[in-house]
Structures are given as structure tokens and as C-alpha cells.
């Protein structure tokens, strides 16, 4: 299907940054509306020809602070909502209440009625390369849910609740670099 290319959708975005009087901190607010095509696996089926572009609105409030000349701390709250997402109809026999952006399986009779919401808090400490060291430590606590075709709120497939990442490295000379990466996250929701 190429008819998605014939539509114009307005996607406004807004970004404001306020530098605090201490000279090393800032508050940042971002908001925006985004569109994306439904997955091609659904668009390829004629019965799904009425699907719309998935609509997303997201916004965040962020506090940023320079701890040193090469180290920055960021703390953010964010929220993202989806609408018009692909969803199975409750009228179809033997359908499970699945948020179809999470699982790509071949279905016909898909509707643009899905909705989802994600809220989270993220902490990030970044150390830019200085004196041959660099790294970052990041942690996120979030909740990602969707409403199924019976309007029951359910966990999305990737709703792990928390994720932590540590990445770091040391470059003793231009030809050598040692790095490490470690990730920890909650289990898949059931």
C-alpha cells in the first residue's frame, strides 16, 4: 500500500529550556505529536485497508546539572500516549487481547482503535571522555500499559518496570580501548 504517502499530517513540537541562576543547571520541557505508519505486515492485508497512522503525543520535564566540566546529571519525567494503534477486534473468533505494536503476527480484521500510555522517571549520569575515561550510568523506572478491546488495562510486552545500564571505558592510548557494558532489567510482565 502506498496510500499512506498521500496524506499530510501535522506534527508540531515544542522545546523550552530555562537556565537556572546557579549557572550549571537547567530545566527543559519538550512536547510533541508524532505519527508513524502501522507495521507493514498489517498494511499488506486488504482487509486492513482502513488502518490509520498511529498517533503519539509525548512530553517530558528534565532537570540537567553539570557536576564537573566533564560530568552531567540528568533527571527526567516523561509521558507518552498512543492512539489509533492497530488492535484486534473483539468480534474476531479466538483473538487474544494483544497490543499489536508489541507483537508482529499476521492478522486480518485489524482496527485502528488501540491506545497505550507510558510514564517514567529516568536518571542519567554521563562522564564525557576526559583523561582517557568515559562512561554513563542510567536508570529508568516506568510503567507501560494499553487498553484492550474490552477496555481492560494490561501490561505491554516490554513493561519491565525498571532498566539499569552501566557503560564505561578507558583508552590508554589511541590504538587501545577497554570498555564494559552491563544492563539489568525487570522480567517480562505476565
Model-derived features with residue positions:
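Transmembrane beta-barrel strands of outer-membrane/channel proteins
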Residues: 1, 16, 29-33, 75-79, ...
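Extracytoplasmic loops and strand-loop junctions of Gram-negative outer membrane beta-barrel proteins
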Residues: 1, 41-48, 56-58, 102-110, ...
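Signature of Gram-negative outer-membrane beta-barrel scaffolds
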Residues: 1-22, 37-38, 42, 151
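Face-selective signature of the C-terminal outer-membrane beta-barrel domain
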Residues: 1-6, 21, 74, 121-122, ...
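Residue-level signature of outer-membrane beta-barrel architecture
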Residues: 8, 16-20, 53, 65, ...
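Flexible, surface-exposed loop regions and adjacent strand-edge segments
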Residues: 11-13, 43-50, 89-99, 142-143, ...
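Membrane-embedded beta-barrel scaffold of Gram-negative outer-membrane proteins
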Residues: 19, 26-30, 53-113, 117-119
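Gram-negative outer-membrane beta-barrel transporters
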Residues: 104-189
